[in-house]
Amino acid sequence: MLSAFKCKNQNGGIPVKNVIIGQSGGPTAVINATLAGAYTEAVAQGADKVYGMIGGIQGLLNEKYADLSQYIIGDRECDILKQTPSAALGSCRYKLPNYEEEPQIYEKLFKILDKLEIFCLVYIGGNDSMDTIAKLSEYAKKIGSNIRFMGAPKTVDNDLAVTDHTPGFGSAAKYIAASVKEIICDSSVYDLKSVTVIEIMGRNAGWLTASAALAKDDDCCGVDLIYLPETAFDIEKCADKVKKLLAEKDTVVLAVSEALRDSNGEYVAASGSVYAGLDAFGHKIMSGTGQFLANYLGKTLGVKARGIEISTLQRSAAHFASKQDINEAVATGAAAVKAAFNGRTAEMSVIRRIFDNSEYVYSVETADIKSIANIEKTVPSEWIVNDNTYVSDEFIKYARPLIMGEMNIIYKNGLPMHLKIK
């Protein structure tokens, strides 16, 4: 059972060790499990207080934070937090400028951290969040601050370097594969020629789109074609392949990345609504690729065509999260805090894959943040096969262990319970 905090300054004169945890970027089904892991480890390490940033670094700059002990009262609340989707603390897409450009932001932030007597800051996020940790740790070193800055990985895109995979990917892959399997069943009901295009998230990395291949099993034929953003997309060549498949079967199902680009690097649906502006880090906000391609194939081939955008469901379906993913999310959060208490800073917790007699085993370590921040990991080219229209068995072996297991969900009035913070 989680115990109440005891101020160590009142019990032996040990310096205050307050911890603050933040969440940043797009949420996942298990980002709150990472928060739970970080929180419980901070309690176990004897932190005096554990704060949560409300709205990430941007919120902290506005002095928005909460004492997490007021919300995570015991094991039950912690378990509910683990099954809560989205980011319980709130998130942001705030690009921290370089110190030389706006030193006043750093000065303000460190003044707030000093006021809260923060010993360790843990930021749960993806590439851009690790960039924030790198900048803050560099500034701390520059001014001689003893605050430790640690990152914990999070992204459904699975594009973080060094770590074998990222918490959030396994649950999203599980939801995508199950949804694809069910869509294939639904699309084959009628005796008529049809095409279904399923659009899946992933800006430059096709890990999530590739996970559609996991649907194939003894009871499912699987998708017919998979198109990833790692390779150039030829819409006419795609139409030819679909036409040939329709000559052999009534229903063709495609899984496509939201960010397909042609050989010139242009988004294939640029004439439609493929993106709607930029986020704070200059990334295009995607949407519309699946519908654009469905419209094109329907018109070109003269068949019924439907575009399905799984959208935020793939990252928010916490009720269907992978147990393996949740366990690893908890472990990475705990590892980041433990490393800080062991004197580490400017690092991120990472997952190492270990194979023991073909059984999936993992360990959690930490790695230098500079080897991770602003580096993007994509699907290996040798895993993209069949003229760039499918993925190899190596991908299946890589991804399958990450979607295994289900949690025992706590329900209320027939629906999963969620923990509200803020």
Model-identified regions with their sequence ranges:
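Short, Lys/Arg-enriched N-terminal segments with co-localized hydrophobic residues
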Residues: 1-15
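N-terminal phosphate-binding or glycine-rich loops at protein starts, especially the Walker A/P-loop
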Residues: 16-66
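Short, ordered loop/turn segments at secondary-structure junctions
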Residues: 24-26, 53-59, 93-94, 126-127, ...
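Short glycine/serine/threonine-rich phosphate/pyrophosphate-binding segments
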Residues: 28-38, 60-61, 105-107, 127-135, ...
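Accessory alpha-helical/coil subdomains and C-terminal extensions
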Residues: 50, 112, 120-125, 131-143, ...
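Glycine-rich oxoanion-binding loops at beta->alpha junctions
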Residues: 63-119, 128, 167-169, 181
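C-terminal non-catalytic interaction/assembly regions of soluble proteins
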Residues: 270-422
